[in-house]
Amino acid sequence: MKIQLNNIQVRANHGCWREEEVIGGDYRVDVWLEGNFEVSAESDDLEKTIDYVAVKELVYAEMNVRAKLIETVLVRMHSAMKVRFPNAHSVGIRLTKINAPMGHQVESVSVEMEG
């Protein structure tokens, strides 16, 4: 079974440019966790599944730690998810930087990791 949180919207100060550090930018995070959640489905017990609120809070906490590269944020967030949710067999994250300052109009830039 896969649990997904889609389009978590975050404002953060990642990037190589001084303006990004000061002004910040908009980000979108998608997280999916795979595991055997049938027991929680049968028991209707939150303690036996992934708490969606805890996932969202972990995303916000990791996005709040500044980095120059979104790749750095992604790897750090992925590691934290694996530690926090050991009952997930696999964790996937897509981190999207909206309107990255690239000199040309690009809607977004994304990095993704799963495992």
What residue ranges belong to the model's regions?
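N-terminal, polar/charged subdomain of small-to-medium soluble alpha/beta proteins
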Residues: M1-G115
